[in-house]
Amino acid sequence: MSINTDETTWQTFKRLWQFIRLYKSGLIVAVIALVINAISDTYMISLLKPLLDEGFGNADSDFLRTLPLIIFVMMFIRGTSGFVSTYCLSWVSGNVVMLVRRMVFNHFMHMPVSYFDKEKTGNLLSRITYDSEQVSAATSQALVSIVREGASIIGLLVLMFYNSWQLSLVLFAVAPVVAWGIGVVSKRFRKISKNMQTMMGNVTASAEQMLKGHKVVLSYGGQDIERQRFDKVSNQMRQQSMKLVTAQAAANPIIQMIASFAIVAVLYLASIDSIKEQLTPGTFTVVFSAMFGLMRPLKALTNVTSQFQRGMAASQTLFALIDLEPEKNEGKYTVERAKGDVSVKDVSFTYVGSEKPALEHVSFDIPRGKTVALVGRSGSGKSTIANLFNRFYDVDSGSITLDGRDIRDYELKNLREQFALVSQNVHLFNDTIANNIAYATEDKYERSDIEHAAKLAHAMEFINKMENGLDTMIGENGASLSGGQRQRVAIARALLRDAPVLILDEATSALDTESERAIQAALDELQKDKTVLVIAHRLSTIEKADEILVVDDGAIIERGNHADLIAKNGAYAQLHRIQFGE
């Protein structure tokens, strides 16, 4: 599932235009204001001809007396049009960036788990933050310059040809060379911009890795290692930025040097007698000033090329990401509440990028209302089985059925509503305890339901000691709670969901013995009318399971209840002796 970034600038801009055109009212107003702004500049230059030919040459002329008023009016128009264009394009740009950013965020939420397994979190964050912000460069600053400077160039050219087409023809010799130069610079800018996106992703990933592992860094004295790692990626980002600045700084004088040949040629032609006879001081000054005035928009267009190409490179990356295939959801079958009969039939599965299967020909049944426990050493494939139930991954062969129907036939959201998962890796949101327990179902349950679930999970024991109780903000990933408290909140969330199938993946691993016993009693009560899959290292928590499966190296090597497996004196009995020191 790789990102395709082979689109041309034009193809990318056409896709971006589909977003821009949604706010065409603001765009139209901005373009009109920009054109007015450019016309005002051109008109100011055109005033040089009557000023020189009539103003100073005719003592009775009223032109000099009206000129201050004309200049005041033109500056007012110029200032007003500049404000309107900047505001409107910023409004358009802000909405486009917000829309693209939302699309990327929403697409991330529908990507398969396998995609996130191989992508750096920092790189993905950079797509939402840095890359989407770069789109603004192509929809505001760049568009302002392109329209305004483009209109200025057209206006100045019209002014030049109107006053002296002979002198103005010089531009036809220079224009192709200038266009070629801008084209070369654009390609360079885009290449560097893509590299900058990659480097920014690395910077974000390095910072995110340190922040998430801050306690480990402090505990092991890893500050120097992390500093060196961050210094390296930061310097790489700086180098790419300097390449962009160098290209931009070199492009300006080169383009202006090429354009200066036109000015030199005009001065030479103006000295030829046959042409000089047709020129008035005002005409020559207007043509020369207009040609010299072309330098500013040419410089601005060269500068804006880097902004535009940054925006195009970012847009290309974001569109390529949006084009990635989301997780498959081809099932149509839905059920309000499943009965809970689960069957795993000859399932094999291999993670992407791995040559060794994680599961091989695994089969077992969990009848409705029964509890099946999976035990075994770490990496044996226990959690993989739980992940397949929710279709975080799809089986390579075999099938998993719920109430006799393949889980791939279920509509994905409806399927996941039938399972409540408590993982060993608890994730809580930066919100209140109540909202974490009722996550994604805030409008479905009453406050009393949330409190009841918290009591069953023995979470109210510590919640009642907090000043704001269930309304306490717990910080990012429950930073203000202990490991055991976080796990009890996660258990309360699963209890509130009241799904027909309960998956407990090391659900009590972070609890002390007393809390574990209390919660186990609540779970025993809860499991009476539910199908339960328990993954456990602590064998004391699964002794009452209807069936225990011993998993090793992706295969089931033993099965039976606790008493039967102890009597067999096999792998389970050995694990039991190790844990209980028998």
From Swiss-Prot:
It holds the Pfam family ABC_membrane. It catalyses: ATP + H2O + lipid A-core oligosaccharideSide 1 = ADP + phosphate + lipid A-core oligosaccharideSide 2. It comes from Vibrio parahaemolyticus serotype O3:K6 (strain RIMD 2210633). Belongs to the ABC transporter superfamily. Lipid exporter (TC 3.A.1.106) family. It is an enzyme of class 7 (translocase). Keywords: ATP-binding, Cell inner membrane, Cell membrane, Lipid transport, Membrane, Nucleotide-binding, Translocase, Transmembrane, Transmembrane helix, Transport. The gene is msbA. Involved in lipopolysaccharide (LPS) biosynthesis. Translocates lipid A-core from the inner to the outer leaflet of the inner membrane. Transmembrane domains (TMD) form a pore in the inner membrane and the ATP-binding domain (NBD) is responsible for energy generation. GO terms for molecular function: ABC-type oligopeptide transporter activity; ATP binding; ATP hydrolysis activity; ATPase-coupled lipid transmembrane transporter activity. The keyword Nuclease does not apply. It is found in: Cell inner membrane. Residues 28-310 form the ABC transmembrane type-1 domain. Gene3D superfamilies: ABC transporter type 1, transmembrane domain, P-loop containing nucleotide triphosphate hydrolases. Homodimer. PANTHER family: ATP-BINDING CASSETTE SUB-FAMILY B MEMBER 10, MITOCHONDRIAL (PTHR43394:SF1), ATP-DEPENDENT PERMEASE MDL1, MITOCHONDRIAL (PTHR43394). One of its GO terms (cellular component) is plasma membrane. This is ATP-dependent lipid A-core flippase. Its EC number is 7.5.2.6.
